[in-house]
From Swiss-Prot:
Source organism per UniProt: Escherichia coli O6:H1 (strain CFT073 / ATCC 700928 / UPEC)
Positions in the Periplasmic compartment: 34-37, 93-99
Protein name, UniProt field: Inner membrane protein YbhQ
Source taxon at top rank: Bacteria
A Pfam match: YbhQ
Key words, A-Z: Cell inner membrane, Cell membrane, Membrane, Transmembrane, Transmembrane helix
Membrane topology: Multi-pass membrane protein
UniProt signal peptide: none
Amino acid sequence: MKWQQRVRVATGLSCWQIMLHLLVVALLVVGWMSKTLVHVGVGLCALYCVTVVMMLVFQRHPEQRWREVADVLEELTTTWYFGAALIVLWLLSRVLENNFLLAIAGLAILAGPAVVSLLAKDKKLHHLTSKHRVRR
């Protein structure tokens, strides 16, 4: 077994994903040391948003090559969602001083995608034709 496969089995992440994690940690440390952590956090969140928009655009592209790029971007955004959510919560904590509002924002940011996904699956179950019986 190659060493890349051993790393993938042990961590669940590919080598390029691990390198991106280390790069983001290095950027956050440099931002902290140079007292520009807020700017670095905003920049990382903006980069995440651009990546999500590019993923959504490329998923509908007629050429297969661009859809494969969208698959890579989807894997990247899935990997980085939790980190981006924590950076957003930290940035919100710099502006909001109400802990209750921060808790609600945290629940919305962290649990929101799971709830939307479950609701979307539930709607799909109601649109089945009568020949596709679903036991409940």
